[in-house]
Design a protein with these regions (language model features):
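A short, terminal or domain-edge coil/loop segment
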Residues: 36, 87-98, 140-147, 224-238
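GST-like fold's C-terminal all-alpha helical module
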Residues: 103-218
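Short gly/pro-enriched beta-turn/loop segments at secondary-structure junctions
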Residues: 178-180, 228, 255-258
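Short coil-to-beta transition motif at edge beta-strands of beta-rich domains
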Residues: 252-271, 275
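Hydrophobic beta-strand core residues of beta-sandwich domains
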Residues: 87-88, 172-174, 255
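GST-like domain detector, emphasizing the conserved glutathione-binding G-site
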Residues: 1-131, 270-290
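Sequence termini and other peripheral, non-core segments
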Residues: 227, 231, 237, 267, ...
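Catalytic cores of secreted or luminal carbohydrate-active enzymes
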Residues: 201-253
Length: 290
């Protein structure tokens, strides 16, 4: 197992579904990490200097002065640093990564609509305003509430895919060992369980999925301690970035380290941030322009 001399710091909040994905990876790999709890809405004054000011999504991983935004980027770095036990026990990395296109988009959007439509008047106005800025569109809770019957149908269809995959008695989505496929799919079940009082009723017919959910929960979140946001900022200020400067020589658009780029959070957010391209290698790392 590879280790790091600098603490792995996760900036997150407890009910963040994408943070839960990373926390479960910590559990699967038995990683020691440091927790920094942040507000679930903007502003986040001690985190914003690390991310360039405008990044709204959660979580953010920090290792010294290296900042990792986007869950797939975070998980990729954790797999690189801690290759055993692997998140790809059968070697199918493409399948592991690509399942996120299902679980993080259509499945998750359905889950969000079901959860907030069910919570209705309990959703705070400041949260609604924050999510409207993130999405660039109305966060229409009454419309979500009106669509609950359709959302239940769609959520049931997504869960049926999980149920079928587990239907031959396997313990995990890919077989005998937990993988990134499990982490990806579990996020939506966890989110419903964390928010809906009637989660038992929603999940009742899916026996294989409920047993798998219990196994996923038992994975835990690794070994964690907690520090303040200001302490994490001090750690970054006293360190220097360690990310290697690499380039993708096959990039058809000719981008290279040092280029100025605009970064848009897809698929929901219209917001753009100007940055310097620090690394470009089957994905990229950016340094914000201040």
């Amino acid at each position: 197992m590879m280790t790091t001399a600098r603490p792995i710091i996760l900036h997150h909040f407890e009910k963040s579904p994408f943070s839960e994905k990373v926390r479960v990876v910590f559990g699967l790999k038995n990683i020691e990490w440091t927790s920094v709890l942040i507000s679930r809405i903007m502003p986040r004054p001690d985190l914003m200097p690390l991310t360039g000011g405008g990044y709204r999504r959660t979580p953010v991983m920090q290792i010294g002065a290296d900042i990792y935004c986007d869950t797939q980027c975070i998980i990729r770095e954790l797999e690189r640093r801690f290759p055993e036990p692997t998140l790809f026990p059968n070697g199918y990395q493409g399948i592991g990564w690509s399942t996120a296109m299902w679980t993080d988009r259509s499945f998750f959007q359905n889950t969000v609509n079901l959860v907030f439509g069910s919570l209705a008047g309990q959703v705070p106005q400041d949260f609604i305003a924050d999510r409207e800025k993130l999405r660039g569109a109305k966060f229409d809770v009454p419309a979500m509430t009106a669509a609950i019957p359709q959302m239940r149908d769609q959520f049931r269809a997504h869960l049926q895919w999980v149920e079928i995959q587990l239907g031959d008695g396997r313990a995990w989505m890919s077989g005998d060992t937990a993988s990134l496929c499990d982490v990806n799919a579990y996020m939506n079940v966890w989110y419903v369980r964390a928010h809906l009082p009637n989660a038992d009723e929603v999940l009742a017919e899916f026996g294989n999925t409920r047993a798998w959910e219990n196994r996923m929960r038992s994975v835990g979140h690794g070994r964690s301690s907690e520090i303040s946001t200001s302490a994490a900022l001090d750690i970054a200020a006293s360190a220097t970035p360690q990310t290697a400067i690499l380039a993708d020589t096959n990039d058809p658009n000719g981008r290279k380290p040092g280029d100025r780029v605009e970064v848009t959070l897809t698929p929901m957010s219209p917001e753009q941030r100007e940055a310097h391209l620090a690394e470009y290698r089957k994905g990229f790392t950016i340094n914000p322009c201040h």
